[in-house]
Amino acid sequence: RLRRNDFELIEDPAIKPLDQIDFAQLLDFDSKVITTERRDFMHKWLQHHHTLVYYDHNYVRGYGTIRQCHDGYQVGPLLAENREIAHKLFVNLIQKADPQAHIFLDVPEINPSALVLMEFLRMQQTSINARMSLNNATIIESSMIYGVATFTIS
């Protein structure tokens, strides 16, 4: 948990709004991480939230989404080829948040690089969540998951 004011925008021409990217390329990148076909989920999830894509040399190399939640803003999913890209996406995504609002990110423990990033960002653990899947969703590349899409019902 942190606040937007803790970070300045990171300028990078590879960071683009979702509407400047071919959706098929985004789906292709997403399929490198998880085997479940997520076209419908992605279309519905992304159309109602702010999404940035890291698009470099004609390839999607990461993307992230931020949305308002009950207690601030939630980032997720945050998928990237490496920690540097995840960091740039995260810092640019949170610029959409109200300056004093809390920022949340659900980080999977299966990616040690994501935990290092959270430490670098000085985020504090506020809760622990269990991840469950239906229909045997398989993660192919856990090293690319820096934040998961979560929907909290309380």
Label each residue range with its predicted role.
Residues 16-154:
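Intrinsically disordered, low-complexity, positively biased terminal segments
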Residues 2-20:
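Conserved N-terminal entry element of GNAT/NAT acetyltransferase domains
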